[in-house]
Amino acid sequence: MALLQISEPGLTAAPHQRRLAAGIDLGTTNSLVATVRSGKAQTLADEQLADEQLIADEQLIAGEQLIAGQQLIAGQQLINEKQRDLLPSVVHYHPQGIDVGWKARNLAALDPVNTISSVKRMMGRSLADIVQRYPNLPYQFHASENGLPMIQTARGLVNPVQVSAEILKTLAQRAQAALAGELDGVVITVPAYFDDAQRQGTKDAARLAGLHVLRLLNEPTAAAIAYGLDSGQEGVIAVYDLGGGTFDISILRLSRGVFEVLATGGDSALGGDDFDHLLADWLREQAGVATRDDHGIQRQLLDTAIAAKIALSEAETAVVSVAGWQGEVTREQLESLIAPQVKRTLMACRRALKDAGVTADEILEVVMVGGSTRVPLVREQVGQFFGRTPLTSIDPDKVVAIGAAIQADILVGNKPDSDMLLLDVIPLSLGLETMGGLVEKVIPRNTTIPAARAQEFTTFKDGQSAMMIHVLQGERELVKDCRSLARFTLRGLPPLPAGGAHIRVTFQVDADGLLSVTAMEKSTGVEASIQVKPSYGLSDDEIANMIKDSMANAQSDITARKLAEQRVDAARVLESLQGALAEDAALLSEQESAAIAQAVALLQQQMQGSDPQAIEAAIKALDAQTQDFAARRMDASIRRALAGHSVDEV
């Protein structure tokens, strides 16, 4: 007979059937790993860290200190419970091995060339893009054959994917030690505006770390999971995510367990790191030291700035000492330095609200995510902008990892996913080029993903045997104003008259935001496809500018589109007429031929102009002149078809 199974409340009655999953917040400054235990999501600490300090005193920078109020914070990094959960996203390479986390972070001042931090900013970008965006990085870069960055270290060349893999590997080891088993899968969070290349790079890093990726999850969506499930809210909320290296604002509607992202915005090159660098530059000026070529001192200044920023979240003043100089910095001075950056985040919030079609008054709650939201000025300004006190009940450093852990627990099969539905969105419209340099949008902006759309297109010329598929991203009407994503060619089309072949083009965007495009000719089944992986990323500022430009140029774009469409129609009419005249010009009298030639000349003249209505009128005039010719051609075609056949046979 069956045995009665008894379990503790909150625990599964069949623990051997429970699969192990984790959520990973792969951050620019810090990373975390979380899991669901006894029905509750919690971040996992590194139990192997010493209680007193992270690394031996001889590895510290002698004499550097910061005084906040009466508290002395020495060069060593003291550990508290929160720091146990955080893993600095820093990797140090040395001849004997690789260090990740706190030890690597503290070695950055001693060996900056071999200590790689904020690698997330390099993910999916070309070397040229990285050098342009971040000209002061201390690393020795080399370009791979395809232009991607390679970093020279004491252990040889490494790329951003390999560096990220070391961070993921360390987090996975922490999770497996805590759970006493191998992970069945992980959910990794990424910024909402990571493009295809950046998302694919994250997946590749996870694969290199030996992890099975259940899903990539947008960071703001992960935060919504953490808060939405815990508090059961319904309505429109804003997720303000200001981390170390990226800023994201998302407007979400929560309704009966459905998480729908109404709009997103932000800046992939703005975060707490920028606050730190601004304060470090200020300290450098105050100390009167030249550090541009001394990466060690620059790192010391940066560490001091970070400690001062943290101290000023609690105290009004902090006394700092660096490079033989000692002085005081106040919260007011820090706020004056970072005020422009905070203002930039609020401008992005305003754009996101407009995109979502809601006002600040309609926002029920504002969720704060990211360690930089602890800065008092940030909380104050965000509260004033939305007219309500932001939510901070879940640790802003941990909320994303907690949301990822909840989603991982669902995807791995430990609980039914009917509790929750996630609807992320596409930030910019996706489409392809048509004749005349026009853009045909296939999937519009803010469409929820995963998504699939298909449209049919046809050939322009008689006997056309191939078609170039040009995939585009953007909101404008003309190809020249949009971003090119990829090109591929569909060959082997049947040699039919213009318009005879029918090509079905399908766009598919998966849950991770990766785009696949397939083109198939319906009668033959011949097809070609491509997976879009841009060689470098698209910043949030560029996305915002593309949307802004589309609004500012809406009227002129419509006019330009009408003009291009009329020119394409005119070209199609002229090409068709040219073929007809080549076959049946004998059906026309000299007077008729002259009238048609005159109408053709007028149409060609109007095509050179910029008046779409004039082109349309010229097309109609030519059509009127050729109606009798078309009727005669039809009669002649019928006579040829019936030649040699009796009435009975017909």
Swiss-Prot record:
Q: Does the keyword Nucleotide-binding apply?
A: yes
Looking at the record's lineage, which domain of life comes first?
Bacteria
GO molecular-function terms, A-Z = ATP binding; ATP hydrolysis activity; ATP-dependent protein folding chaperone; heat shock protein binding; protein folding chaperone; unfolded protein binding
The cross-references to Gene3D superfamilies, in alphabetical order and at most eight, read: 1.20.1270.10, 3.30.420.40, Actin, Chain A, domain 4 (3.90.640.10), Substrate Binding Domain Of DNAk, Chain A, domain 1 (2.60.34.10)
PROSITE patterns, sorted: HSP70_1, HSP70_2, HSP70_3
Q: Which UniProt keywords apply?
A: ATP-binding, Chaperone, Nucleotide-binding, Repeat
The segments labelled Insert in the record are 49-82
Map the sequence repeats onto residue numbers. 46-50, 51-56, 57-62, 63-68, 69-74, 75-79
GO terms under biological process: chaperone cofactor-dependent protein refolding; iron-sulfur cluster assembly; protein refolding
Which Pfam families does this one have? HSP70
GO cellular-component terms in the record?
cytosol
Cystine pairs annotated here are none
Family, per the entry? Belongs to the heat shock protein 70 family.
Purpose? Chaperone involved in the maturation of iron-sulfur cluster-containing proteins. Has a low intrinsic ATPase activity which is markedly stimulated by HscB. Involved in the maturation of IscU.
Know the name of this protein?
Answer: Chaperone protein HscA
Q: Which organism is it from?
A: Yersinia pestis
